[in-house]
């Protein structure tokens, strides 16, 4: 059986990001994508109208159901949406240190729409940084996570916060 990557992310009904994009990218790499849906978004390719986050309990139930059935080798997270979901993912990762973890600290949609309270999420993401094997922030996320404008300085700060690879 192919290796499985468990993706924690939101559902974008336009299919341009989130779980759909993860499923396609992981499939193209030859692995199987399993999902734990963190939120249902209301968006199209131009705008985010809102979202409803999955409860922490439901999120963990999805993840544990998949772990009991499929050969998980790695975890990838995108939109988490709430501090409860960030805490739930951190709990899950501590239970499963054998999984490689890719953190994409999503704060806004590609269209620029908010996917949660940015200041609150940034504070919570600090818990995930040292758990990640690689972090893939864009420049907006890198600046938000570190509070620094200069990209070289911000990258160094992210390493100081516990990042292993960026």
State each model region's role.
Residues 42-43, 107-109, 142:
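A short, flexible beta-alpha/helix-coil linker loop
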Residues 62-127, 137:
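Glycine/small-residue-rich loop that forms an oxyanion/phosphate-binding "nest" at active or ligand-binding sites
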Residues 118-166:
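Conserved phosphate/ATP/ADP-binding segment of small-molecule kinases
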């Amino acid at each position: 059986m192919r290796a499985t990557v468990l993706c924690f992310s939101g559902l974008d009904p336009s299919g341009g990001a989130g779980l759909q994009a993860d499923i396609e990218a992981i499939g193209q790499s030859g692995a199987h994508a399993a999902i734990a849906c963190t939120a249902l978004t209301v968006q199209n390719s131009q705008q985010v109208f809102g979202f409803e986050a999955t409860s922490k309990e439901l999120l963990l139930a999805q993840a544990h159901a998949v772990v009991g059935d499929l050969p998980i080798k790695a975890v990838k997270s995108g939109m988490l949406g709430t501090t409860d979901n960030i805490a739930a993912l951190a709990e899950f990762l501590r239970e499963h240190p054998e999984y490689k973890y890719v953190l994409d600290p999503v704060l806004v949609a590609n269209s620029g729409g908010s996917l949660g309270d940015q200041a609150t999420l940034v504070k919570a993401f600090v818990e995930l940084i040292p758990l990640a094997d690689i972090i893939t922030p864009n420049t907006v996320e890198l600046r938000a996570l570190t509070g620094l404008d200069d990209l070289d300085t911000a990258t160094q700060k992210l390493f100081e916060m516990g990042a292993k690879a960026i």
